[in-house]
Amino acid sequence: SYTGRLNYAGRSGSASDSMEAEEQTPGGVGIQVQGEWTHHFSPKWSTTVNAAFATKYFPDITADVAVRHYLKNDWEIGAHVGYGRVAAYTKRYEWNDEFFAGGTGDNGYLFTGWNESKTNLLTVGGELAKTIEVVRLNTKIDMHFFNSNFYYNAQIGAKYFPANDGKTNINAMASIGSAPETAVLDYALPGSFSHTNTMVGLGGQYMVSPNITIGLMGTWNTYYNQTNTVRGSSPLNPIESISTRYKNLYNIYAQVYISF
């Protein structure tokens, strides 16, 4: 079967590209377009291949291949490998004579914006799931390969299917790991890896017709954020330091699924 997904994300923030020191990207909306192909080789084996492209608030490019094996008593195991092209941000500072003269005389470097670079992220993961009547429980762990190091993110989830269509559901999830949940990697990089990051989410999906399903998902991410700061009393001698703190990020995702 083939499935097309359209994901929409809205974020608060500046209405222009002139961001404040705590905003890595301006506010607005982002769109992700995803295509997916699923094939059942037998009653016990299936594979799924998907790829996605996005404007902002999502990784630029993602691709994933998954294999699933169906066991007795409604148990499932799966494995997947994926690739994502995500953004990393560093603060940009420039020397400003007027700022230096109007201050206390110990700093003349003024924040002027964010430098953005792209980072390749490889992911390998496994999943275990169990269906109990109208409830599906699952747990999965992802290993992320980034900057020659491995990091992890573990997630648990539950879906309740109140209808008999197999698609309408209410779902909840939570995750913890040394890497943040994949959906916020653009906001978390750099510096978020090797520290504890958490996420909780709640949402649902409704089947409008046999070919169209709509969904709404809200998530709350708490992630470790690391940024650079430049100070100095001379344009020839900048002093760079690192500031760290935990940040909260709230997302609301609107989703449209079209299958055929």
Where are these regions (language model features)?
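Repeated loop/turn-to-beta-strand initiation elements of outer-membrane beta-barrel proteins
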Residues: 2, 40-49, 73-79, 132-139, ...
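Transmembrane beta-barrel strands of outer-membrane/channel proteins
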Residues: 2-10, 49-53, 63-65, 79-85, ...
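Solvent-exposed loop/turn segments connecting transmembrane beta-strands
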Residues: 9-14, 22-32, 52-63, 85-90, ...
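Membrane-embedded beta-strand positions in outer-membrane beta-barrel channels/transporters
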Residues: 32-34, 62-66, 76, 123-125, ...
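Residue-level signature of outer-membrane beta-barrel architecture
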Residues: 39, 69, 128-132, 160-162, ...
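Detector for outer-membrane/organellar transmembrane beta-barrel domains
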Residues: 96-186
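Outer membrane beta-barrel transmembrane domains
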Residues: 159, 167-223, 228-235
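Outer-membrane beta-barrel "beta-signal"
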Residues: 206, 245-260
